[in-house]
């Protein structure tokens, strides 16, 4: 019988640390860039997480200068802590070109009080397709202005369902009465599936978010048992 090993974590968390929070937030770096939207699989309510095969990420924004800018993008694979994966070449995680691709879906505003230019990009596309799961940083820059960065988008790509680890999450109510109104306690169980895990503390990174917020995420709670 094949019994999946599991890792159980109790998280009394919930005045949480601010670890690597900036990297996971979408950032607008130019005051003329507005209305940045990042939508996974046509569902605006979801976090920006797509599947390795079949998922689609849509990124759009408006440029209030109403002037044509040759915007391009660069795709960077990142580690669990959102630092660039230095051990990987671009060809290891991207089919096509990870940088230098231009955003060609451009529309000028018509009959609006404020003039703007709308730019839209979808991933994967014919020039750039992710071929490895993990965290990704998408950087948009202006080729007409010395490659000046105007926005950064953080998103994640997951393995197909049959290759994923199993994760179960349960909110508990038996917290101490003195903190029950201010904190939450959750129990997380991670099934290794077909992966060989000999050192969970080093091989597995866990993150628990409250209302999809990275600024108060709980990282790497110590497991109660394995």
Q: Which sequence ranges carry the predicted segments?
A:
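Long, internal scaffold/assembly segments composed of regular secondary structure
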Residues: 205-226
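Bacterial Sec-dependent N-terminal signal peptides
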Residues: 1-25
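Low-complexity, Pro/Ser/Thr- and charge-rich linker/hinge segments at domain boundaries
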Residues: 27-28, 157-183
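Contiguous beta-strand segments within globular domains
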Residues: 34-79, 178-192
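A short beta-turn/strand-edge loop motif at beta-sheet boundaries
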Residues: 64-69, 129-130, 194-202
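Internal, hydrophobic beta-strand segments that form the core of beta-sheet-rich folds
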Residues: 132-144, 207-210
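Extended, solvent-exposed segments with strong compositional bias
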Residues: 95-116
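Ligand-binding face of N-terminal immunoglobulin V-set domains in extracellular IgSF glycoproteins
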Residues: 115-127, 133, 140
């Amino acid at each position: 019988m094949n019994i999946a090993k599991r890792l159980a974590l109790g998280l009394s968390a919930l005045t949480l640390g601010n670890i690597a929070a900036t990297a996971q937030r979408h950032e607008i770096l130019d005051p003329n860039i507005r209305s940045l939207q990042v939508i996974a699989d046509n569902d605006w309510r979801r976090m920006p997480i797509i599947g390795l095969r079949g998922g689609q990420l849509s990124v759009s924004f408006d440029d209030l200068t109403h002037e044509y800018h040759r915007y391009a993008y660069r795709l960077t694979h990142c580690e669990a802590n959102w630092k660039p994966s230095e051990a990987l070449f671009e060809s290891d995680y991207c089919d096509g070109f990870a940088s230098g691709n231009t955003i060609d879906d451009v529309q000028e505003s018509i009959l609006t009080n404020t003039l703007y230019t709308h730019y839209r990009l979808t991933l994967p596309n014919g020039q750039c397709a992710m071929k490895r799961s993990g965290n990704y940083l998408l950087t948009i820059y202006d080729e007409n202005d010395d490659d000046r960065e105007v926005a950064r988008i953080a998103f994640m790509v997951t393995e197909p369902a049959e290759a994923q680890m199993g994760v179960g999450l349960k909110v508990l109510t038996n917290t101490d009465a003195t903190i029950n109104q201010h904190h939450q306690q959750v129990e997380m169980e991670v099934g290794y599936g077909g992966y060989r895990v000999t050192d969970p503390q080093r091989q597995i990174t866990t993150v628990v978010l409250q209302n999809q917020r990275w600024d108060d995420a709980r990282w790497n709670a110590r497991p109660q048992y394995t």
